[in-house]
């Protein structure tokens, strides 16, 4: 745990640090976020973490408009740095593909046909609000917080706030709207950083055959740029 003298900072994430950050992601969400559970299958197992880390590494290496950040704590000179949080901010000028198989190796990640179909339908609805925001930007684009996770042992210490404000500052500098599909648990944090709910509960039409599965509870939140 942190000591009173510890400070939280934000820095760019290296490829080598992605496995550590994926463990933070898994511990942060546990099994309380259905979208995370489906998007990163078995994320709390060694095989799931290996696969998730591999996917994040490919994302980081191929998406030039995505910035991977870490929140770190370091008590003083010579003390070991601890990664306690992770965030991914993306400058998005083109609408994301509505078809999951255009952004993921779907057969490898979701070998079960029902899981794949369920995730495909979730994804199709998930990208609708940000797609509309991009269309409404008249070519400027938006700044999207695609992932935010803070280790449960280091929450309420400012890591989440620092990671969010890094992106809202970058959005302001570009004159762009910032958006996030946030969980209800994180709502207060986002509101403290200036984001406001535009859609109180995002809609996921997954069909009658998946009525027994947990659907995500996500709030679509936005923040206008401050000049």
PLM features per residue range, with description:
Residues 9-23:
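A short beta-loop-alpha structural element at the N-terminal edge
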Residues 43-70, 74, 94, 115-118, ...:
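A short helix-loop-beta-strand connector motif used in the catalytic cores of GNAT acetyltransferases and
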Residues 66-68, 84, 215-221:
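Short hydrophobic/aromatic beta-strand or adjacent loop that forms the aromatic wall/cage
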Residues 79-149, 155, 202-216, 227:
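Conserved acyl-donor/pantetheine-binding loop and adjacent beta-alpha core of acyl/acetyltransferases
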Residues 130-138, 162-177:
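Conserved acyl-CoA
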Residues 145, 178-182:
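Conserved hydrophobic beta-strand within the GNAT/NAT acetyltransferase core sheet
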Residues 150, 156-169, 192:
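Conserved acetyl-CoA-binding loop-helix of GNAT-fold acetyltransferases
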Residues 161, 173-175, 184-204:
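Conserved active-site alpha-helix within GNAT-family acetyltransferase domains
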